[in-house]
Amino acid sequence: MARRDQDKLTGKQKAAILMISLGLDVSASVYKHLTDEEIERLTLEISGVRSVDHQKKDEIIEEFHNIAIAQDYISQGGLSYARQVLEKALGEDKAENILNRLTSSLQVKPFDFARKAEPEQILNFIQQEHPQTMALILSYLDPVQAGQILSELNPEVQAEVARRIAVMDRTSPEIINEVERILEQKLSSAFTQDYTQTGGIEAVVEVLNGVDRGTEKTILDSLEIQDPDLAEEIKKRMFVFEDIVTLDNRAIQRVIRDVENDDLLLSLKVASEEVKEIVFNNMSQRMVETFKEEMEFMGPVRLKDVEEAQSRIVSIVRKLEEAGEIVIARGGGDDIIV
């Protein structure tokens, strides 16, 4: 293999050379942990390797060794700890090079370090920040963690932060890096960079699912005034039909009483076995037999009809919850049933 080609090896080619260098026994044990597709791709690369000089083999083995060590350091104490150890052992430039490749392959998200911090620590930092900064940080955190923080913000700020998470699309790496840098100083952690999709309605739904019912109501009521369409879209996604499995038996029975049989039939037609089992367990035996018989002879159904039927059932679930007749489990353990 020409020297010029060696300097431009791809990750797949390096993996192939590493397997060859490790020998048959070790390579065979590695293969046991790969998928069929990965084995096929790797074998194809190995078959294309002609000759590699010892120096290049040693460089690839050393590179693999350094990355493996770095990954171990990350699992022990995060990127910050890994960076400190590698810089001390290998120097700043080499450590940075290794971590850049590793974080790229691991797809480390921005603010990954913040997931290890207590919600109170993050709250102390962000509560005086602009709502857009709060939204950016919360959109990257674990939903339960973000929900706890959102619950503690001033009520007049909560809805605005939730709205900004919902309408957030892409954020430039420069802004992410700057916010991370400041947060790093406060929490003694590290940052990563790249354009990353964040925010959106799904993100705010996950966050709101992590707050208590009172906080959720306050935020949604405020959003109803600011942006009714957005509030309605968020409500639709707060509880989906499949979430019926999280309700207790009494709640499911109450829902069944209010829904139209045709809507329930359509919804169950394409539902998972888990959903069907839980719903059937809360019906009379005669009703179950009737439903199963009708489902068996029901022809193909349009996805749009199913989604509309499930949406109507979800609306009933939310109305029953708002009326206090059923309870939907929330994050934070604040839903007390007496």
UniProtKB/Swiss-Prot annotation:
Which GO terms of the cellular component aspect does the record hold?
Answer: bacterial-type flagellum basal body; plasma membrane
Q: Where is this site: Part of the EHPQR-motif?
A: R164
The record's NCBIfam families line, in alphabetical order, gives: fliG
MF terms from GO for this chain are: cytoskeletal motor activity
Subcellular localization(s) per the UniProt record: Cell membrane; Bacterial flagellum basal body
Q: Tell me the function of this protein.
A: One of the proteins that forms a switch complex that is proposed to be located at the base of the basal body. This complex interacts with chemotaxis proteins (such as CheY) in addition to contacting components of the motor that determine the direction of flagellar rotation.
Q: What is this protein called?
A: Flagellar motor switch protein FliG
Q: Which family is it part of?
A: Belongs to the FliG family.
A Gene Ontology biological process noted in the UniProt record is: bacterial-type flagellum-dependent cell motility
Q: Which Pfam families match?
A: FliG_C (PF01706), FliG_M (PF14841), FliG_N (PF14842)
Residue numbers covered by motif Part of the EHPQR-motif: 129-132
Keywords attached to this entry: Bacterial flagellum, Cell membrane, Chemotaxis, Flagellar rotation, Membrane
Gene symbol here is fliG
- Cited InterPro entries: Flg_Motor_Flig (IPR000090), Flg_Motor_Flig_C (IPR023087), FliG_a-hlx (IPR011002), FliG_M (IPR032779), FliG_N (IPR028263)
* Membrane topology designation: Peripheral membrane protein
What SUPFAM superfamilies does UniProt report for this protein, alphabetically? FliG
Q: Which cysteine pairs are covalently linked by disulfides here?
A: none
